[in-house]
UniProtKB/Swiss-Prot annotation:
It comes from Thermus thermophilus. Belongs to the succinate/malate CoA ligase alpha subunit family. Substrate binds at residue 158. SMART domains: CoA_binding. Its EC number is 6.2.1.4. Succinyl-CoA synthetase functions in the citric acid cycle (TCA), coupling the hydrolysis of succinyl-CoA to the synthesis of either ATP or GTP and thus represents the only step of substrate-level phosphorylation in the TCA. The alpha subunit of the enzyme binds the substrates coenzyme A and phosphate, while succinate binding and nucleotide specificity is provided by the beta subunit. Can use either ATP or GTP, but prefers GTP. NCBIfam families: PRK05678.1 (NF004230), sucCoAalpha (TIGR01019). It catalyses: GTP + succinate + CoA = succinyl-CoA + GDP + phosphate; succinate + ATP + CoA = succinyl-CoA + ADP + phosphate. Pathway: Carbohydrate metabolism; tricarboxylic acid cycle; succinate from succinyl-CoA (ligase route): step 1/1. This is Succinate--CoA ligase [GDP-forming] subunit alpha.
């Protein structure tokens, strides 16, 4: 497991909103330790037995917090993430999509400088199977096992996790890094953590067209990775210049093309699955 486990104490920013309340219940049902919530103007109330504060600073004065998850509307989401980082919260999971790109550029830089780790935006979050879920993924498809997943896609992640669970391989930690062009944590940031994690025996890297994160990850794998990695690239049939579902899934010139990603994976010795079921076959093969 990496980053989170059943002891991780979680703050929910935007806990009183519709999504915030719904997912707080889902996370609590999964066993996640939610210690506090924040919604400006709603301090002193409770949501599902969780105390609500007006500010993150106030919440951390009353509770030990290891991670924050953010369900705040797009115009205020980057500021919410910065508020968490300034309060010293080490892990920040930003679910919100549609955050202005310039807001994200600023937030990512500042959060890094403050020493916190940002996952997202526009991501499903992070789950350590059967331990804790800090996100919006369907918890029941994640069975505890041997494979780490890092993904730019939400739904493909759930399908891959379900397939690995059904095959008896299961997952350790799964991180949805988000589908936007500017995100806080990339494949390359997480690979070293899985590389050192005693429970993870193989890693599935679910990329998609657009950007160069997959290429950078492949270069890192080639030079440093001790464990087998299996790749998958979503959106391989997409035409150039057309955004496919995610803001980050757009091919500009020769950067972000499926060919460029497949070439990088091939050079790093990463086998690439064409289907979700093939991910399972390749992981089985890699683990012997």
């Amino acid at each position: 497991m990496i980053l989170v486990n059943r002891e991780t104490r979680v703050l929910v920013q935007g806990i009183t909103g519709r999504e915030g309340q719904f997912h707080t219940k889902q996370m609590l049902d999964y066993g996640t330790k939610i210690v506090a919530g924040v919604t400006p103007g709603k301090g002193g109330t409770e949501v599902l037995g969780v105390p609500v504060y007006d500010t993150v600073k106030e919440a951390v004065a009353h509770h030990e917090v290891d991670a924050s998850i953010i369900f705040v509307p797009a115009p205020a989401a980057a500021d919410a993430a910065l508020e968490a980082a300034h309060a010293g919260i080490p892990l920040i999971v930003l679910i919100t999509e549609g955050i202005p790109t310039l807001d994200m550029v600023r937030a990512v830089e500042e959060i890094k400088a403050l020493g916190s780790r940002l996952i997202g935006g526009n991501c499903p979050g992070i789950i350590s199977a059967e331990e804790t879920k800090i996100g919006i993924m369907p918890g029941h498809v994640f069975k505890r096992g041997r494979v780490g997943i890092i993904s730019r896609s939400g739904t493909l992640t759930y399908e891959a996790a379900a397939a690995l669970s059904q095959a008896g391989l299961g997952t350790t930690t799964t991180v949805g890094i988000g589908g936007d062009p500017v995100i806080g944590t990339t494949f390359k940031d997480l690979l070293p953590l899985f590389n050192e994690d005693p429970e993870t025996e193989a890693v599935v890297l679910i990329g998609e067209i657009g950007g160069s994160d997959e290429e950078e990850a492949a270069a890192w794998v080639k030079d440093h990775m001790k464990k087998p990695v299996v790749g998958f690239i979503g959106g391989r049939s997409a035409p150039k210049g057309k955004r496919m579902g995610h803001a980050g899934a757009i091919i500009m010139g020769n950067v972000g093309t499926p060919e460029s990603k497949l070439r990088a994976f091939a050079e790093a010795g990463i086998p690439v699955a064409d289907t979700i079921d093939e991910i399972v076959e390749l992981v089985k093969k890699a683990l012997g």
